[in-house]
Amino acid sequence: MKPTKMRNKMIYRASYQTKSKQLGSALSKDLQKKYGKRSVRVNEGDSVTILRGEFKGVDGKVAEVSTAKSSVAIEGVKKEKTKGDKFDVFIHTSNLLVTSLNTEDKWRIAKLEGKDPRKQPKEAPKAAEKPAKEEPKKETPKAEEKPAKEEPKETKVEKKSEEKEDEN
């Protein structure tokens, strides 16, 4: 089998996890200097520029990422059907340049900066910042503990043996 056919089989039969890893796109020069990486996985909210294809030169934010299609929908990039309906055009991530990142995901930023995200301090929720006044808990006297069972339950085997003894 030709190598091209083998490669295409690997791509189209890949698991979603592998396809997700294939959704990387090049970073702009300033982001490359900042993070020391050439490419990053595209997420919703990233700003991108289209480098190749019909929509070359268009800037926009990523509206949707489709791992099944291995491509991305961008705000403002739409086509019109003959009836007048508009639909998103999905563009492969290899044809994009990431100009700014969505920084809401702290885990992602920590990974880009080369820090271990598991060792990052977790931010406390806003509700937990104001501790409520807690009343000291009153110790309630415990009820008398029940004594341990003195006689264990009879098992079926014991019952049968007793019945046989009674019959004899």
From Swiss-Prot:
PROSITE patterns: RIBOSOMAL_L24. Gene3D superfamilies: 2.30.30.30. GO terms for biological process: cytoplasmic translation; ribosomal large subunit biogenesis. It comes from the Archaea. GO terms for cellular component: cytosolic large ribosomal subunit. Keywords: Ribonucleoprotein, Ribosomal protein, RNA-binding, rRNA-binding. It holds the Pfam family Ribosomal_L26. One of its GO terms (molecular function) is RNA binding. Residues 112-168 are annotated as: Disordered. Part of the 50S ribosomal subunit. One of two assembly initiator proteins, it binds directly to the 5'-end of the 23S rRNA, where it nucleates assembly of the 50S subunit. Located at the polypeptide exit tunnel on the outside of the subunit. PANTHER family: 60S RIBOSOMAL PROTEIN L26 FAMILY MEMBER (PTHR11143). Belongs to the universal ribosomal protein uL24 family. This is Large ribosomal subunit protein uL24. The gene is rpl24.
